[in-house]
Amino acid sequence: MTTATEVQIVEARKEHIPFVAWVVMAANRSHLPKGMWDINVGGSEEDVLRYLEVLADTEQLHWAHYSLFKVAEVDGVPAAGMCGFFENELGPVSMMAGAAEVNQKIGRTPEDIAAGWERSKSIMGIIMEHEPGAWVVEHVATKPEFRRRGLVERLVHEMLEMGRKRGATTADIGVLIGNDPAQRAYEKCGFRVVIEKRDAEFERVYGSPGARMLRRAL
């Protein structure tokens, strides 16, 4: 006999911060062993998650802040998450301000900050430009034990509806080259590749040739 599972899509709350930190770490890793935060922060996975938990709860809003996330819960257990935002509201300046807040809170030295940037800066070679007013869907990840249940599709539907209500007419989402399952999932939701960027230094450091941006109308 099987029991039915209950799936709920909820706005992230304070108690979701550890899960949001994991989502940000996992989304940045994509299909690779390490992502930007692993390389920038350094240390163990616990060190990275600790940093991202503080980042998720800064005074400054940015695209890794817990309040921007929606979470899919399966029988009350956080299983998948993603966020959405307008770049003109919460672009790179907001993230830099949030990171500065974290660095101060955890006592990261200027030398540590500079070394982390030196290790991770090749990420700039694949940064995408978004159309004005595009709703940016970011930081998408599902816990391994909850994959293949359609949670990403449900979250994307909710996140796109939020973008429509905010007045967006297009939505963008990114994927690293080589993460074919993620790209297929986004294409299933109506996204199509519009830009591809490759960078040799990014590939040397991270292990992927580059990234693709997908877009769809809302």
Summary of predicted features, one role per range:
Residues R148-E161, R184-K188:
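Conserved acetyl-CoA-binding loop-helix of GNAT-fold acetyltransferases
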Residues S30-A56, G98, V102-E111:
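Conserved GNAT-fold acetyl-CoA-binding loop/helix
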Residues T169-D172, L176-Q183, C189, D199-L218:
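C-terminal "cap" of GNAT-fold acetyltransferases
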Residues G42-F69, E73-V74, K121-I127:
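Active-site rim helix/loop that mediates acceptor-substrate recognition in acyltransferases
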Residues N88-A134:
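Conserved acyl-donor/pantetheine-binding loop and adjacent beta-alpha core of acyl/acetyltransferases
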Residues A134-W135, G163-G174:
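Conserved GNAT acetyl-CoA-binding A-motif
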Residues V71, V77-F85, V136, A141:
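Conserved beta-strand in the GNAT
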